[in-house]
Amino acid sequence: MSRFQSLLSFVLVSLAAVANAAIGPVADLTLTNAAVSPDGFSREAVVVNGITPAPLIAGQKGDRFQLNVIDNLTNHTMLKTTSIHWHGFFQHGTNWADGVSFVNQCPIASGHSFLYDFQVPDQAGTFWYHSHLSTQYCDGLRGPFVVYDPNDPQASLYDIDNDDTVITLADWYHVAAKLGPRFPLGADATLINGLGRSPGTTTADLAVIKVTQGKRYRFRLVSLSCDPNHTFSIDGHTMTVIEADSVNTQPLEVDSIQIFAAQRYSFVLDASQPVDNYWIRANPAFGNVGFAGGINSAILRYDGAPEVEPTTTQTTSTKPLNEADLHPLTPMPVPGRPEAGGVDKPLNMVFNFNGTNFFINNHSFVPPSVPVLLQILSGAQAAQDLVPDGSVYVLPSNSSIEISFPATANAPGTPHPFHLHGHTFAVVRSAGSSEYNYDNPIFRDVVSTGQPGDNVTIRFQTNNPGPWFLHCHIDFHLEAGFAVVLAEDTPDTAAVNPVPQSWSDLCPIYDALDPSDL
């Protein structure tokens, strides 16, 4: 091997190591545009510190995260401006750092930076982060985020939990989101840990996840999806779910997991099978489905197994994950009274679609020119004073809230996964069930609203002043207006959420931009 080849090999290995290495809790995130080919097809993308998916951010419960976003984006097609949402964090007292463009901030301009500075005093588990401007995260600005608990109550169930046990799932498109169809009919490829194949690139590299026989692994499964849900399984292995969306659950053994856009699960895998290679499968709900040529797949490789593709076969799932079977590890009281509508403020979200835009209670969300938080800080308190008109719901403080999402054929593209910012919520009625559980339902932050006939119902307590986005996490549906803002405790929002000068500077800088620089 020549010295040059040796150096090149070292550089490539080093880059691979960098891609795996976690950053945080204090870190710079430099955003640029670069050509990438995660499935063997080259296209321009939005990358973070040179890679997509973005680097794993990691810290510990109680940490202060200081994440400096440096916007060096130059490709107008994928937007030069940006903002980043830290998905699943309560942001109590730092609503300004929640990262939703035109709800919590103005976007960051190219050539500028912005420091997201927030505390995580009482949360641990699996999170993620992504652009919250238009459909930008579909073009690559998305990555996993883990907060470790030094006193994890389930630590006895596993031996290994580290950077290498995070598994990301992403849909990948060969055309930038802004240039493709308004509602794509499916992704070109499914990426598992940033690698995958499309039907036309079946020789591309696949992700390899290594295990040692006899060890128990806590895998953290993160859906970075823009659109499809995926059914995840590992040939020859069961999975014991112990966390959903950063909430510890009672252990539940399953053999497949349907994971919707933006959801996360931790599961324990006991590497007790013969030393071999096993297919990891993540079948999307639509588009390029199946596993021909190794699409929608990765490899679980036991130490000592040959470096070849698996020959294992998929068996029919007999223990699929059912959300209604998930229960919190420690009791979490459900807000309100144990009866339908037994809350201080019930809300019903009626979905519709006109062929172009989605509507909730007859209003399609159009991002306002002044962020909702800035409107509130400027003195607007009542719903009738806040824009966009009809899309902002003012919620009283210290109150129990119930939201019902009756699924209907009037809003195609089901099931729609809905995410509430600033909270976890009790899922008192899950998709596929007509039962209400006020005793021990799962708490989470993204819920499937199911199919026509379902009436998924959630509850939470208003203990976090500020405007919080509630939206479909299919990014193409959000872009088409499938969202509302819940403005919680508007009278106390300013006092609880003091904003830094750098935040106040964002809007004047953004508003002065030429349209070609947006």
From Swiss-Prot:
Residues annotated for Cu cation 4 binding in this entry: H416, C472, H477
Alphabetical list of SUPFAM superfamilies matching this protein: Cupredoxins
Residues annotated for Cu cation 1 binding in this entry: H85, H419
EC number: 1.10.3.2
Gene Ontology biological-process annotations: lignin catabolic process
Catalytic activity: 4 hydroquinone + O2 = 4 benzosemiquinone + 2 H2O
Residue span of region Disordered: 308-330
Root EC class: oxidoreductase
Glycan attachment points: N72, N75, N229, N354, N362, N398
Signal sequence range: 1-21
Cysteines paired by S-S bonds: C106-C507, C138-C226
Note on cofactor: Binds 4 Cu cations per monomer.
UniProt main location, coarse: secreted
Subcellular location: Secreted
Purpose: Lignin degradation and detoxification of lignin-derived products. Cleaves the C-C and C-O bonds of some phenolic lignin model compounds (such as O- and P-quinols, aminophenols and phenylenediamine). May also be involved in synthesis of phenoxazinone pigments.
Similarity-based family: Belongs to the multicopper oxidase family.
PANTHER family on file: FI03373P-RELATED, MULTI-COPPER OXIDASE
Name this protein carries in UniProt: Laccase
Organism: Pycnoporus cinnabarinus (Cinnabar-red polypore)
Biological classification of the source: Eukaryota, Fungi, Dikarya, Basidiomycota, Agaricomycotina
